[in-house]
């Protein structure tokens, strides 16, 4: 790096929100924007893996493309995902594709000072191979809920190589503990980045007639919104004198199932599916919310919980690992995973004490 020149970081994510799921890996975009705003020269390389179902269209697909974002550019290259036939061959092809992107990138932007990969396999492994070959320091940040698989069985050789040729970080402390205790891999905590400033507006007055719950989530397996709906059904049956409203923000592959479940449980009059919303729209919804409800079976971090706290909104969450590191009695109620009755009890506890919570402590959590 030349004297007085900005730090140059090249980000390599495993996931990127350019397919049907516009939320998967969205934190990578927030991360790059934050680096750029801090004065770091930042860009991104992404391998867009196409499933074999895309094979008929693949020959005519544009193989190389780019996407301009706030403060950085994402350089993309498509490849076929052949992991169903051979995971080893797929990873080798992935590494070659990343190197092609890297060589083209260096011609345009010069050699980066740091490679920052997100998720150990495949992006972390590919970055570690690049770093060793081209003498570039590598940082890996692990986000995946199934990260232990990268250090076990046939994948272990790739995960261990990546960890030994990088500075290893994870978004939550429980992940670093597992890496250290089970796999003898030193790692530090590097939390996800969120734009909390967007959520620090004033809260709207409470609605004395209703306790308003909100879930902000991609509607995909593992988010377990069906458990939240079951908890709402229990509340309605056991406490008919209490009124709850539940807003679900987001979309995804489980949306139709969740809507069908809400209807079957007779909850259509109190449950609203409002679809995907912008950051400012989510902030407005949270300003009119009494508690955020998270029902996931596992979250490595939990950005919606951080956004809710920034908005002064307490959180009701399952004990889903990541959020437990920053939720406490001043701002949250916890319940067991896949336990609608325990979630019902947590909602009742929060409803009973929400008026006594210190908004300043919630925002500072």
Spans of model-derived segments:
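N-terminal subdomain of nucleotide-sugar transferases
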Residues: 1-66
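Carbohydrate-associated surface elements
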Residues: 174, 193
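Conserved acidic donor-binding segment of nucleotide-sugar-dependent glycosyltransferases
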Residues: 329, 333-340, 349-355
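Aromatic "clamp/platform" in nucleotide-sugar-dependent glycosyltransferases that forms part
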Residues: 297
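Conserved donor-binding/catalytic core segment of Leloir-type glycosyltransferases
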Residues: 10, 169, 205-234, 247
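Short hydrophobic beta-strand element within catalytic cores of glycosyltransferases
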Residues: 314-317
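Short alpha-helical donor nucleotide-sugar binding micro-motif in glycosyltransferases
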Residues: 276-277, 284-289
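Nucleotide-activated donor-binding/catalytic signature segment of Leloir-type glycosyltransferases, i.e.
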Residues: 259-277
